[in-house]
A protein has these predicted regions:
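Hydrophobic alpha-helical transmembrane segments of multi-pass integral membrane proteins
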Residues: 1-138
């Protein structure tokens, strides 16, 4: 597995675990103010990062693009900045607003980079796979 796919899948598990622990904590305390944070950690962190990672696993040539590395850092940093800002806002700290907005735009930028990486990967001819009939060798 290439390093980029691995980093995304590890980040997905970390974000998903944080989202689940937050959900469990909210259920135990009956304090659901951070429910939007729980949702974003699970959907943006766990699901989106897992999709990114599995895509880069399936298209290893796409993971070698410089834009793919930029995309990872935009996505990872954007998630942390956005979630920090969102948590602050939900706990009535207005100072979280610029962080939530900045993180949102970073996350959007990461998705647009991902689209660019995919377009570039789909435009490049893939190496032909030479499958031989059973019993024949090259």
């Amino acid at each position: 597995m290439n390093g980029l796919a691995q980093r995304y899948l590890i980040a997905a598990v970390l974000a998903g675990s944080c989202g689940m622990m937050l959900g469990i904590g909210m259920g135990i305390t009956h304090d659901f103010r951070l429910a939007p944070l729980h949702v974003h950690l699970n959907l943006l962190g766990w699901v989106t990062f897992a999709i990114y990672g599995l895509t880069f696993r399936a298209l290893p040539e796409a993971a070698t693009q410089g834009l793919a590395r930029v995309q990872f850092w935009l996505a990872a940093t954007g998630l942390v900045v956005f979630c920090g800002g969102l948590a602050a806002l939900r706990l009535d700290y207005a100072a979280g607003f610029p962080f939530a907005v900045t993180g949102s735009f970073m996350t959007l930028g990461a998705m647009l980079c991902f689209g660019g990486v995919l377009l570039r990967a789909f435009a490049e001819p893939r190496a032909a796979s030479h499958v031989l009939p059973a019993g024949r060798t090259a």
